[in-house]
Amino acid sequence: MMKQRISIFLLFTLLLFANGYAQKGIMRLTQQTLMHEVRETPSPLDGQHITVNPPRFMWPDKFPHLGAVLDGVEEEDYKPEVTYRIRIARDPEFKSEVITAERKWAFFNPFKLFEKGKWYWQHAYVNKEGKEEWSPVYHFYIDEHIRTFNPPSLQEVLTKLPKTHPRILLDAEDWDNIIERNKNNPEAQAYIRKADKCLNHPLKHLEEEIDTTQVVKLTNIVQYRSALIRESRKIVDREEANIEAMVHAYLLTKDEVYYKEGIKRLSEILSWKKSKYFAGDFNRSTILSMSTSAYDAWYNLLTPNERKLLLRTIRDNGKKFYHEYVNHLENRIADNHVWQMTFRILNMAAFATYGELPMASTWVDYCYNEWVSRLPGLNADGGWPVSYTHLRAHETDSYL
């Protein structure tokens, strides 16, 4: 009994101590939120001591854009094309050795290490008449022992981008070597087995594949579209895995049977965009992903009409995603599914068609610079932690 009383007393004392400690640790906030959903302040902040050299320059959009709330529920937002200018110098009057740039999005990467000391910068929105609306002049500091992280500029990257295909999943110059290295690779064999299975199971039209027994009972438009997307994604995701298997099987063997069945299957999938059962950004990004992989892997086998079909699909879907992201994604504090999936796919499409699709050069410029501006993380202590399932989303092929 005495031991029980002592235990209760110790527990009570511990709770009082913990409560007192917790009270001391309370942070009183004066702001409405801990962070902005959409950027409202420039970076670097005025007077900031930079943590990584060179700094990435970002500022609020002239026309902040929230985007759609739910995948598949389209919203018409006013989002005009914009032009921004930026200038950076050691003096606040910007009279000598000024770094200047003009961008179609609200960020800029200088790709040069900054000397230690005090720097000044300013950004401007340029209207259609060419009039500049300049921000206040901000200053920041480059300290003595700052970390450096200066990736190559886009111009340097593009000099090393192969002009031949394939060039995304593998480099054509290393193709035969990759095949030889992976003859006994279990992962490579798994792709080939899956592709062989697809050869014996022709694909039906979406309306014959999708299960809509529960969807048709819904009367709420949001629930209806959400359920429709969920059911159609089951089919589209399955076929993405099948096309992926046939693309990989061809790259691992150069056996044209995988191209012939794969392009037939993909052509059927691309016809689904006219179906009332096909909707949503995830489905569109999957279409973009499949078309990009097929275009790059089977480039040398495609007929003129097949190549035209894939390029048109990449152009139409890539254009939509680019327009959705530019002057939106760069100023969102977090948009995790975009970074994991749809934006990554736009990157692949951009580099796969660079030099062959006129607008791909703009996509490449935006995508590459957006990655650089957001790395090595959203803040000085790194990026966001991922769970096991999120790590699975970033898996790559070991045979590559």
Over which residues does each language-model region extend?
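Recognizes extended acidic, P/S/T-rich segments that occur
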Residues: 78, 83-114
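Extracellular Ig-like/FN3 beta-sandwich strand-entry sites
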Residues: 116-118
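Extracellular fibronectin type III
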Residues: 130-142
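Bacterial N-terminal signal peptides
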Residues: 9-16
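Low-complexity, Pro/Ser/Thr- and charge-rich linker/hinge segments at domain boundaries
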Residues: 141-170
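Aromatic-lined, polymer-binding surfaces characteristic
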Residues: 227-392, 398
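Pro/Thr/Ser/Gly-rich low-complexity, intrinsically disordered linker/stalk tracts
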Residues: 24-67
